[in-house]
Amino acid sequence: MHPTRSFQGLILTLHNYWAEHGCAILQPYDMEVGAGTFHPATTLRSLGPKPWKAAYVQPSRRPKDGRYGENPNRLQHYYQYQVLIKPSPPNLQDLYLGSLKAIGLDPTLHDVRFVEDDWESPTLGAWGLGWECWCDGMEVSQFTYFQQVCGIECSPVAGELTYGLERLAMYVQGVDNVYDLNFNGLEGDEKVTYGDVFLQAEQEYSRYNFEMANTETLHQHFIDAERECEAILKAGSTGENSLHKCVFPAYDQCIKASHVFNLMDARGVISVTERQSYILRVRNLARQCGEAFLLTDAGGFNFKREGE
């Protein structure tokens, strides 16, 4: 299935490319997240000394970005393609350019530029040295070397690539409206567009995010998720020799708190002062999850580097 003819073909091509370069092709995380970085395969696995290579698609939700389906390229629900390689290989940029060529954007035929743009996620306590990747004047992906995640230094440094799939697909298909994207690669009566799949949901979720979400309920959900995250970590910390700290269930609650915060923000019920307070509360949960992860086997607690 040719990547320039369908949205699903673009995804399949990226899957095949990164699988051939040693990445485990994972599935999307089954929770509401604001970006592919929130997937534990990135947030948690970027920590600790253990090598890690993974790629996956992640549905992402940013409630404030909804436009009731009336904007041709702005969505409250969209898809990111995420690649994380730890330690970051010296040829990561070449691998990225190879992926562009695989999906039909030959770097020798297009103006591909890397524009310095360091990345930060305040709620995750994460930042990295990064670049926006522009093709013929349009941003198509982000290229980051993680320095810190969950407030913890990344050692070794992990390399992350994030592709905005809708924007990339619009470029390779040559369409100006995201809802006109060919989704399945067929034509005529069998053709399915991005709008056929997602337009109604985009309209309805915009109404919910901006007009209908019960703010009192959301506030309580945030408190509940915060308490549950800390309670899980406390319960999982019993026993000094335990390498199972219940990090993943706790991190799920951190993700829930983050999404609820984003919904409250979209509803316009968070002041400037409160906003910073909520961000710090989510960041504190992420930090606790990251610290607990490093005390587990998956986090590299008993891992020995070569030569040690």
Swiss-Prot record:
Pfam families per UniProt: tRNA-synt_2e (PF02091)
Protein name, as recorded: Glycine--tRNA ligase alpha subunit
Top class in the EC scheme: ligase
GO biological process, one term: glycyl-tRNA aminoacylation
CDD domains with a match to the protein in the record: GlyRS_alpha_core
Recorded name of the encoding gene: glyQ
Family, as annotated: Belongs to the class-II aminoacyl-tRNA synthetase family.
Record's keyword annotation contains Protein biosynthesis: yes
Keyword annotations from UniProtKB, A to Z: Aminoacyl-tRNA synthetase, ATP-binding, Cytoplasm, Ligase, Nucleotide-binding, Protein biosynthesis
Aminoacyl-tRNA synthetase among keywords: yes
EC number, as in UniProt: 6.1.1.14
Source organism phylogeny: Bacteria, Pseudomonadati, Pseudomonadota, Alphaproteobacteria, Hyphomicrobiales
